[in-house]
Amino acid sequence: MANSFINKKVDLTTTDLTTLYTVPSFKAAVVKSLLVSEDAGSGSTITVTLVNSSGAIFNLFKDKSIGSKATTELLTNPLVMEESEILKVQAADANELHVIASILEIQPREVTT
């Protein structure tokens, strides 16, 4: 199978930077949705970063507010990721946020001559 839909989920039980998804070798990925829900009733913030294959860090969302008992879709357009890139998330408060990413993994076709 060349392409497959997957999802990755994390319960942010700490305030540590947490890997949500890493693009596998020889693949690309399109993140179609990035949902964040707050379940503690107090509201929180989330930071989302993309780390490229060279280790450079790019902030996608910095201290994005998530309302009390709310679910927020962070992406307004798909996010294209390349091989070995990493999507990381970090909560301002432990045990308040859940994150779900819906992803299309793409296996490039082999070209023969």
Task: Give the residues covered by each predicted segment.
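C-terminal interaction-tip segments
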Residues: 1-29, 33, 90-113
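Short beta-strand segments
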Residues: 19, 44, 58-62, 72, ...
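A generic structural signal for short beta-strands and their flanking turns/coil linkers
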Residues: 27-32, 44-46, 83-85
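Short solvent-exposed strand-capping/beta-turn motif centered on an Asx-Ser/Thr pair
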Residues: 36-41, 92
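Beta-strand signatures of extracellular beta-sandwich domains
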Residues: 47-51, 100-102
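Short conserved beta-strand and strand-loop elements enriched in small hydrophobics
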Residues: 49, 87-88
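Short edge-strand/loop segments of extracellular domains
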Residues: 52-55, 106-108
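Intrinsically disordered, low-complexity Pro/Gly/Ser/Thr-rich segments with frequent PxxP/GP/PP motifs
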Residues: 53-86
